[in-house]
C-alpha cells in the first residue's frame, strides 16, 4: 500500500488530507460480504487481494469511485463556500457522499423491472408514480395532451371490466376532446347524439375524420358541452357558472334535449322561469290562435278583407255605442274577442313578443300587438251652436292584434299610368301630347283584345267616295 500511489484529484486543494481521510474513513458502505471481510483485515489483505486478477480489477474500479467521490465532495464544498449562510444547504458532505454512493451503486446494477424513484435534484418520476397519476387524472375526468384538454367520460353503471373493454369514441367540441363511451348516447335515442351513434352509425351516416375523431356540436362551447354530457350520465344538466340560461337553452335545442324543470338545475331561478314561461306562452297562444283568433280572421277574409284588427276585451266589458253618434276613429271595423284569459295573456310584454314570433312563423305580415284605448259606452254629448255635436265615450285600455295576409301590398299603391297635367283635360291622348318626349309613356303600342272587339266595321271600298248628303239618282 505504501509503494502504490493514490489517484490525484485536481479539484482537491489538500491531497494529504484526503489520504488521511481515506485511510480513516469507515468502509461500511459496501454491502457485499467480501468487501466487509477485506475491510476488517486491513492493508495486508489489500496487498494479497491485489495479487489476483479479478480482485485487482475490482480494486481499481473502487479506486476510481473514490476519486470520483473526492471530486464530488470537493466541488460540493466549493459550492457551499460560495453560498450565503441564509441559503446554505444543511445536508452534510458525509450524508451527501452516502447518497451519491448509493445512487452510483444502484446505477451499476443491471436493469430490473422495478421502476426508479425520483431523485432529490428533480430527475424523472417513476413509472409507478406516472401510472398512479394517470389513473388519478382519469378518475377526475380530465388530463392534458399537447396543450388541449381531454375529458374521459365513463358509464358509472358498468363495472371496471366492462369499462375497460367497452368501445370509446373521441368527440371534438370547441377544440376540446371528449373520450366517451357511445353507449351512453344510444340510451337516449331521441337526442341528436343518440341518433348519430345509434342508427346513424348503423347506416353509415355518422363518419369520423381522418384521425378517427368526430367533430360535433358546432358553435357550442366546451363548458356547455361538459354540462350536457352529464345529462347522459345522470339525467340532469347543471348550468355552469358564467353560462347564461339562453345559451344553455340554445345548446339543448340544437342537441334535441328537452329543456324542462326536471332536467335543468341552476342558481338563477329568474332566468330559468323566464325560459319556461316562454315555452308555456307559445303553447298557450297556439291554442288561442286556433280557437279564438283564426275564426275572426276567416270572417274578415270571407268579406273580402286582407287584414284583420282584433281587440281583446274582458268578460265584464260592455260595449254600448250610440247609433246616431258612433265613435269616429274606425273602431267599427274592429273584431272583438271577449276573453279575460286572453286579456291577461297579452298583459305581459314577453307574451306579446312570443305571440308575434308565432304569427310570423305562420306567414302573416304587418303584425302589430299592443294596448290601446277602446270606446265602450257613451258618456255625454256636447252640442255646439251651429256645428256637429261632440260625443264623449268612455275608453278602456285593452290589448289589440293587427295582422295582414296581403301578398302584393306594394303593388296596390303603385300608379300604373302617367298622371294628367290638369283635371279639366279628360282626353288622355290630348294630355299626353303636352308631355315631353322623354317622359312620354306609350299607353298601348299594340291593339288590345277589347279594342279589336269595338272597332266599327268598314264599308266597301266603292262607297268611300260617296257624299252621304247627296240624293240617290235612282229615286
From Swiss-Prot:
Q: Which Pfam families match?
A: BTB_3
Keywords from UniProt, A to Z, are: Cytoplasm, Nucleus
Q: Where is region (Interaction with AKT family members) located?
A: 146-475
Mind telling me which SUPFAM superfamilies this protein's record contains?
A: POZ domain
Residue spans making up a coiled coil are: none
Role = Plays a major role as an activator of AKT family members by inhibiting PPP2CA-mediated dephosphorylation, thereby keeping AKTs activated. Plays a role in preventing motor neuronal death and in accelerating the growth of pancreatic beta cells.
What is the protein named?
A: BTB/POZ domain-containing protein 10
Q: List the gene name.
A: Btbd10
Look up keyword Nucleus and say if it applies. yes
Recorded hits in SMART domains, A to Z, give: BTB
Cysteines paired by S-S bonds: none
